[in-house]
Amino acid sequence: MGESVLSRLGQWISNTPLRSLDQAYEAALRIKAIEDQYFQGGSIGSNGQHGQNVSRYFQIQLRRQLRQIDLRLAEFRASSAFSRLPDPEQNGSGPTSAQDKAQQLHAAEANVSESSSENSENGRQRRDLSILEKLQFIDQVTSRYKRPTRKSQPISASISTSPEPLERPEQPTSTQPSSSNVSVKAGSGNGAAPVASKAAILPRSILRTASQIRRELSSQAEEELIQEYREARTRTLVSIRFLLLLAILPLLTQILSKNFLFGPLVDHLQQREPAIVALSHEFQEKALTEFEFFKERMEFERALHHQSPEWDLESADQLSMKAEELLKKYSRRNSEGLKNILADLLSLLVFGWLIFVGREEIEVLKSFLDRLIYGLSDSAKAFIIILFTDVFVGYHSPHGWEVLLGNLAAHLGVPENRDFIYGFIATFPVFLDTLFKYWIFRYLNRVSPSSVATYRAMND
């Protein structure tokens, strides 16, 4: 029985990549069916034949299917690293001609919304397609909707929509003329010479202004502006969603794994094998110190009441109860630290998995942060820099570091080491202050000199 369960579990894990790819392929088929049935094969929302409520319904369905495709493809990429995939060109006995493949796709698209009795036949047709064919079909369907979230789009969009300070590092005058001269020499004919002379004579700001006026007078200016706003909104939504995932998912993993996985496991081991979760040397010293203080206080009270210095049965029972109480107290602290360490490691693995899977979202997040930071005024940038430097490396920062390290030691279940805390406070803020100054001198002074001037004026 146990072997059959393990074999089924192993088979389910090994089939996870293909199952995720099939689910993403089904979502792409649903989008394609809506396009063919209601939009004559065009993109959803491209024509104005439908009313506002109908268009809104189709947009909701589109976003739902695109979200399903993103999640299943991310699951496909993550599970492919741990499972062995079949040959991408030999995944089943599929059709060999392009006409048969087209007929098969058409049949699957036509039956995508049929009842559950026909789902097995559609599933067989989908399995007949190879992995590359499914991925190609998904890319073909989502290409017109997923452009803002591609890896190259956020970079180009962020460069085109970023403020002026981002372009300053790309304006050295010593290398630009040489590259233009090389292009003139490499070209054939005399048509490139006026272009080089024009670029050398006229400032770039005039050329940018002329191109901006030409874009504004274009007949497609409104559509381009709307498209830019849509792309900016998409980048913002993707960035906020990814930040929430990075913050919430590891935190939930830490809490749930500690309370429902590692907590019962450590408690069971502690009850069964107490030596596995034994008290550390520091906790033993603290328990003995507290026990000696309790014992001396009892002797002091007995001396005040002129009682016999010999211990009676009641006093011995009190000492025994106090020893058991101290043992439970420090054993709980020791086991809580072990639970926190295991849960923190698991949440760190989840965080690393999110970073590995969401590489495209990281590119979008970079462009979003660039627009957000460089869109601030110089005084706002200087205020943020002063706030961070004063909090982490300022005059009152040692007290904050001391509290932070003390809470970290309690979280890990280890006693506070004052020598380590004082040594850390004496070295790490100094290194952090040097890093801040180097960043301001090397990067911020080159990108936004006005912010550096404002920062120095406010700091003085």
UniProtKB/Swiss-Prot annotation:
Membrane topology label: Multi-pass membrane protein
Keyword Transmembrane: yes
InterPro entries given in the database record: CemA
Short name of any one Pfam family annotated for the protein: CemA
Compartments reported by the entry: Cell inner membrane
Region (Disordered), start-end ranges: 82-128, 143-190
Keywords: Cell inner membrane, Cell membrane, Hydrogen ion transport, Ion transport, Membrane, Transmembrane, Transmembrane helix, Transport
Polar residues composition-biased segments: 90-102, 151-163
Location (main, coarse): membrane
Signal peptide (from-to): none
Gene Ontology molecular function, alphabetical: proton transmembrane transporter activity
Keyword Transmembrane appears in the UniProt entry: yes
One Gene Ontology cellular component annotation held by this UniProt entry: plasma membrane
Low complexity composition bias: residue spans: 107-120, 171-184
Chain segments annotated as transmembrane: 242-262, 337-357, 373-393, 420-440
Record family assignment: Belongs to the CemA family.
NCBIfam families per UniProt: PRK02507.1-5 (NF002706)
Function recorded in the entry: Required for H(+) efflux immediately after light irradiation to form a rapid H(+) concentration gradient across the thylakoid membranes. Together with PxcL, contributes to transient H(+) uptake following dark to light transition.
Name of protein: Proton extrusion protein PxcA
Organism: Synechococcus sp. (strain JA-2-3B'a(2-13))
Top-level taxonomy: Bacteria, Bacillati, Cyanobacteriota, Cyanophyceae, Synechococcales
